[in-house]
Curated annotation (Swiss-Prot):
Natural source organism: Dictyostelium discoideum
Family that this chain belongs to: Belongs to the GID8 family.
Primary localization class, coarse: cytoplasm
One Gene Ontology biological process: proteasome-mediated ubiquitin-dependent protein catabolic process
UniProtKB keywords: Cytoplasm, Nucleus, Wnt signaling pathway
Domain LisH, residue spans: 29-61
Protein's UniProt name: Glucose-induced degradation protein 8 homolog
PROSITE patterns noted in UniProt: CTLH (PS50897), LISH (PS50896)
């Protein structure tokens, strides 16, 4: 089969038929694809969809699907500012997660302090910092620095004017919830992030590399797999 070239910088042109022939030579098992889908559903927390997919495809997972609901409840609690509830659920799920991860535990306590500051509960925030966080800071300089930054929010009558006001943003809750979610997944021998988005990023990168070398049937719709 001969290759053709375009007049645009003499780029190699690959026809759709040639491309399809090459794709046909790639062997991807249905089982591997099913595992990829299950990986995404479990990690992203789609419990009902994962259970239905498991039933229909007979794809097994090492995770108890019932635990997905607990993990989502924990993430939701942290994102809503109810740190105590999140800690309670994770301890019921697996107390070793926090017992073996002092940094995670500190960040949860730090988030609890942030929530007290957000509510304007200055006296309670100072007492909580002194009783719960200061002892951890004495044993870890990094924790102490983070505690001092958090407490500095109280210097400003209007916390929104603090250089560290980002600690009060919803993104900080999401960051803490994400750290805890990753720890739970790790305890269940799961990836902390689903594989599918990474594969799609690799696809985009590979197509960018090809764009400079040839003209080919480029995928423009990753949902349907349609070429341009």
């Amino acid at each position: 089969m001969s290759n053709s070239y375009s007049s645009n910088a003499q780029k190699k042109v690959i026809s759709t038929s040639e491309w399809d022939d090459k794709l046909a030579e790639v062997n991807i098992s249905k089982s591997d694809l099913n595992k990829l889908v299950m990986n995404y559903l479990v990690i992203e927390g789609y419990q009902e969809a994962a259970a239905k997919f498991q039933e229909e495809s007979s794809t097994q997972t090492t995770v108890d699907l019932a635990s997905i609901a607990d993990r989502m409840a924990i993430r939701s609690a942290i994102q809503c500012g109810d740190v105590e509830k999140g800690i309670e659920i994770v301890n019921d799920l697996n107390p070793e997660i926090l017992d073996t991860n002092p940094q995670l535990y500190f960040h949860l306590q730090q988030q609890k302090l942030i929530e007290l500051i957000r509510k304007g509960m200055t006296a309670e925030a100072l007492k909580f910092a002194q009783d719960e966080l200061a002892p951890q800071g004495e044993e870890n300089n990094k924790f102490l620095e983070e505690l001092e930054k958090t407490i500095s929010l109280l210097v400003f009558e209007d916390t929104a004017k603090s250089p560290l006001s980002s600690l009060l943003d919803h993104s900080q809750r999401q960051k803490t919830a994400g750290e805890l979610n990753s720890a739970i997944l790790l305890s269940q021998s799961q990836d902390k992030d689903p594989k599918l988005p990474t594969i799609l990023k690799l696809l985009k990168w590979a197509q960018t590399q090809l764009d400079s070398k040839c003209i080919y049937p480029k995928i423009t719709n990753t949902v349907t797999g349609e070429y341009e």
